[in-house]
Amino acid sequence: MRDNEGMNLALFEARNLSKHYGSATVVKDVSFAIAPGECLGVIGPNGAGKTTTIRMCLGLTAPDAGSITFHPRRAGSVPAAGGGANRAPDSKSQSGLQLPQDALAIKAQLGVVTQFDTLDPDFSCAENLLVYGRYFGMKDAAIRARIPQLLEFAALTHKANAKPGELSGGMRRRLSLARALVNDPQLLLLDEPTTGLDPQARHLMWERLQTLLGQGTSILLTTHFMDEAERLCSRLLVLDHGKKIAEGTPRNLINQHLEPDVVEVYGAGAQALADSPLKRLAARLEVSGETVFFYTQDAKLLLQSLAYDYPKLRTLHRPANLEDLFLKMTGRQIREEA
């Protein structure tokens, strides 16, 4: 989807967002749009501006410049101030709700899963859902009617009366997701939703998120896992030093910025290959630790030369992926959190 297309069809629009803290520019002129049923992934190294961007989208941090607009596609299940549940959107909703003036109306259509659990440890799973629904002004009867469905969706029916401390990490993340769905949101904002989960728990979380996308829910996702981004996201927004440096589908970004074939060479003496005649067989190469990465349009001749001249070195031939893209655009140097 092209940027102009995205803006025309958008459920959610952020235009020219900027944020400064003193003399430091944290986010600079960032724009993006999210269509109904689309997952937009925001990726970037530590300090790229991801968290600040999400906080601005949630209305928790006021941008110094730019605008945020939400275009409801249906009436929500949450009553607005002075109105009943499931009422038709008014003319203002149809023309777009704006932050900060329409913050309450927008938040009623959002679901949020933060990186760290914010579940109430004193309440059971079912009670966590009930209490959270009350924050949206929902009637207890309406919330209780949704709880069995939400627990089933999260594969937690058998844990309805258990407290969060009795759950595994994966169960707590799924309960957080179920809680974010209490108000039947049109847009989910997920901050590192599978951090700390084992592979089985991650895959179950991905399955649930894909189900939501199939039902038309939109998702704004931040992640450090490139396999997660490639699996879930229809488009990616790449941030670095507060600026948008790329946007597009995962496959298009890979095709536009990378050579199709990657050969990893590792083992004793592999680093010396960076200055060997083999470098002429690659469009570019990178050295990271004891591994040399050759990026090439066709790896056949390179692989033959490696097998003949360096039989003791280990090689891995694979297609270019999002991790290669991420490292090319943002560098291999580790950045610590501020």
Locate predicted features.
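Helix-to-loop junction immediately C-terminal to a conserved catalytic motif
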Residues: 58
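Conserved ABC transporter NBD signature motif
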Residues: 66-76, 86, 90-99, 105-106
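Conserved ABC ATPase "signature" region
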Residues: 130, 134, 141-159
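Conserved ABC ATPase signature
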Residues: 163-167
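Conserved catalytic motifs of ABC-family nucleotide-binding domains
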Residues: 184
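Catalytic Walker B motif of ABC-type/P-loop ATPase nucleotide-binding domains
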Residues: 188-191
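ABC transporter nucleotide-binding domain
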Residues: 206-297
